[in-house]
Amino acid sequence: MTAMPTPEENNELSTNTKKPIKHKKLIIVLSLILVFIIALVSSFFIMVKIGEIRLKNSLVSSVKVEGDSEEKFDVIYHNGKKYKYNENLINLLLIGVDADNKDKEYQGQADALYLVSIDTVKNKVKITGISRNTMCNFGMVGIDGEVYSTEYGQICLAFAYGNDDIQSSENCVNAVSDLLYGMPINGYYTLYLDAIAKLVDSVGGVEVSVDKNDVDTKFYTGNSKSLILDGKTAYSYIQARGNSNAPRVERHKKFITGFINSAKRSIAKDLTLPFKLANEMKKYSVTDIDITSAVYLATEAINWDIEFVNIKGEYGIEDGWETFTVDDADLKDVIIGNFYIEI
C-alpha cells in the first residue's frame, strides 16, 4: 500500500510545480517586450529611411536649367569638362523672416537666406549664404497664388510678394533656384524672428566669437574673444544691420555654427529634443518638410561636417537701398564646385 504524502511534501510539490509556470510567464513577458523593442527600433529606422527618400524625391523649385536639352538638372559642360549633378545631395532652403510672428498683416521680408546642401553619403553639409540684398528676378504672386509677372530687385522682397506664408516661401525658393541657374531645392523651412530666443534657450545658449566691430558694444566687454548668447542677446545679435548687411551675414554664420554645436550637445543628452523643438516651433515657422523627413534630418545632424560657402559680388546703392550683384563667373564656379561631380 502506497503511503500518502505528508502536508510538507504536498507544499514542496506545489511549489516545484508553480516555479516552471512562473518562469514560463516571465519568459513570455520578456519575449513580448523584446518584440516590442525590435518593432519600435525597426519602425524608427524605417521612418528615417522613408524621410530620406521623400526628401530626395521632393522638389519645390519649378525652375529649369537654362539651355538644358533634358528636363532633368543633370549633365553640364564647363571649361571643357563634363560634370554631373551630385544626386546624393538634399538641398533645403532656410528662410529667416524679419517679422515677429506669422499671424500678422505685414508679410515681412526674407532677411536671411541659406541653402543647406546635405551630402547623404559623405555626411557633409555645405551652407551657401545668399545676401538679402542680392539683385535677381522674382515672381509677383496674385491672389490666386499664380505668378503673373516678374520683378527685378532685392531677393528679400520675394517673400513680401506672396499672399501667405506658403506662397511667400515658395516664391523665395523659386527665386533662389533661378539665381543659382535652376538649382533643385527639395524643401524649405521658414522661421520668424521671435523664434530665435526660444531656440537659443532650448539648447542652453550659443557661443560665438566677437570683437568690438562685430556686435553691439553693450554685449562686448573687451575681456573675451567669445560670448555666450542667451535668447534675448541672440535676438539682438542676429538682427542688427547698421549701414550694411555684410557684417550681419558674417554674424549669422557664427550664430549658425554656434547653434549647431550647442544643439548637437543637447540632443546627445536628450534624444527627444528635436521633436520637442519641432512642436514648439510650429507657432513660429512654416515648412513643407514632413515628420518622417524631420526625423531623418534630426538623426543625421549629429554627424554632420559643416562648411560655409560664399558667393562673391559687388555692393552698391540704388535709390537709397543697398544692393549686391553676384559675380556670375564666381557663381558658376561655386555651383560646379559644390553641387557637381566631374565625369
Residue ranges and their predicted role:
Residues 18-24:
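Membrane-interface anchoring determinants
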Residues 2-9, 13, 20, 30-31, ...:
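Non-catalytic, solvent-exposed segments at the cell envelope interface
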Residues 36-38:
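Hydrophobic core
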